[in-house]
Amino acid sequence: MKFDNEQLLKYIGACTSPYHTVDTSLQMLLDSGFIELSLEDEWQLDSGSYVVNVFGTTLFAFHIGKKPEHTLRIASAHTDFPAIRVKPNPITSMKGYTKLNVEMYGGLIENTWLDRPLGAAGTVVLKGKNAFDVDSVLVDTKRPIAIVPNLAIHMNRSVNDGVKLNRQKEMLPILMMERSNEDNPTKALNYRNNPSLFPESDSQYDEWTKFLADEVDCDPSEILSYEMTLYPTEQGCVLGTEGDFISSPRLDNLTSCFGVLSGIIQAKKMNFNGIRCAILFDNEEVGSRTKQGGAGMILPNLVKRVYDALGYSNQEMDSFISKGFMISSDVAHGLHPNYPEKNDITNIPVLNKGVALKIACSQSYAGDAKAIAIVKGLCEEADAQYQIYVNRSDIPGGSTVGSISAAMLPERTIDVGLPLLAMHSARELMGAADQEQLNRLMNHFLGGK
């Protein structure tokens, strides 16, 4: 059966913030028969498939086979991506324009965000019964609400020579034209005559708070806080005269999330011995050092809770971990045809040639000789194409969560990922044949013997 990239694009289109990535992924697993657990409850486990929402932006799913002591296999990815985040108290004005005060999340390529229609997605937290019992609501505008316009070439003749953007000044999106009570004479007159009839006046809540209140359908006074991401509203697409490519926002790292989810669903279907786990971390793009990130204790704590609930001792658990294996999936740099000198001279991954096995002697990518051999064998057994990626010796690449999480859970680990062009652009490019190869690897790793 031909692999359906439209399912990948549909998934990416729904995952417009880390919160929505977890929500969409959780629903996929629940629809596949996984049982949802809570971090706050005591777990009673038996053979079966389970999923845990971790603080809203990280997801942990696992399948317990008939004999759980046989193997521990873990596949990981991350739910976050470079983006523009809205600051608190974000409304600022300039000569009739209403702008949003924002900050950059992760290492995005700034100029690729200019002139793009931007939507907003994330979570809004509302007042609850008391300070500790608040309500969180997911929000996705699903329509463009803001834009960061470029400066015309007539006002910047050197723009094509390269421009460094000031994030605080030149990356602020326009939200709307300023409004005032004078724009609505009836409202203005009524407010002057009877201000008590308008307790939620324009001076009390800014335009952003009122906008969020409209999206959530609540009173502005109920909103306590939010985490909102701006995202390009253009959808991903297959392109090229022969349909060879996929152009889309957020390929880093939703391609990996999609592959890992495919694998853990396959684990449930096949029900082999051992414990098979999938974890989608948050905050990889900003260093992972958070409660829900790969540099925290969340993965070892979750694994321990699984083995505790099954009645195993710490010593038995340590033994299973030492015999286990983890694949960390994050994208790699494919050969760019306009910049071929940027890649290594002998280890050159290209689009549409399969999964890249990422190797770095600095351990910025996790792996050792045995781990590399194991994943090559898995690819061959799964009939999944693979290739080798190593950075140029004089151009350090990025790091990812593989080495970080392996340091917290000492299990043999390898970093893999799909080759991309334009990584961290507002719109990235991948090979249309490659997602199938990653899914094959993950299906075999988590769902195979």
Task: State each model region's role.
Residues 1-449:
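N-terminal hydrophobic/helix-forming segments and targeting peptides
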